[in-house]
Amino acid sequence: GSKGVTNIYVPYSRHDAEGNYAEGGEGRSNYQLPILVSGSTDNPSNVTVHVAHDADTLNILNYARYATRTELYYEDMGAEGLAYASYPESLLIKAGENKGLLDLKFDFRNIDMSEKWVLPLQIVDDASYNYVAHPRKDYAKAILRIFPFNDYSGDYSGTGITNKVVTGYDGDGKPIETAESITKSSIRGYVIDEQTIFTYAGIVDEDYTCLLYTSPSPRD
């Protein structure tokens, strides 16, 4: 994924083929995460893969990327005391198969979608297991950025939206705005619930980046 984080898109509510809730009700969903057995030949025996929460890697990534700007940190869906995500701690991959699907369950009810929610996972190593986790960290660990979607979320054209900057106020207290509108080619709608989305104001978005450049100046 981009910079160590993989975007995962799941429906806000999972439905079956008849349109009924498939995971117990509105705001509940799931995602089947592929787990692979690597090697030059097919997997010769049953392998029970053990999966665990990985708060340490998320903490390292947050500090490396944002340092003391804790308001920008990714939030951990799997943190103790939260019920937004669950998953089995082990997965059986049968002999002759090279892939298993770990069933991640999500409960989006009452979650604050303005936060950047992720689920950090890792494949666990132990001498008693009949496998070895891949030595490359990005093969044995995953930080999943969870994006729920509904019928209204996604990208919309932003060319018709007017965004002006207030530079001051006149003598009557009316705002003085810039003549030109700050435009953005598209805006993204993020899920609140089954029928509701929100967007970020102006040109700012979750992944908005401002680059500052400096040039050396001659000494006096």
Language-model region placement:
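A compact, surface-exposed functional segment
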Residues: 103-144
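Short gly/pro-enriched beta-turn/loop segments at secondary-structure junctions
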Residues: 139, 149-153, 182, 191-194
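Intrinsically disordered, low-complexity coil segments
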Residues: 14-22, 134-135, 164-181
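Short, surface-exposed beta-strand/loop "edge" segments at domain boundaries and coil↔beta transitions
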Residues: 58-60, 129-131, 164-168, 203-212
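Tryptophan-anchored aromatic micro-motifs
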Residues: 151-171
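N-terminal glycine/threonine-rich, aromatic-flanked beta-hairpin/loop signature
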Residues: 169-212
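Acidic/polar, low-complexity intrinsically disordered N-terminal segments immediately downstream
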Residues: 1-89, 93, 97-99, 111-117, ...
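Conserved small/polar residues in nucleotide/adenosyl-binding loops
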Residues: 213-220
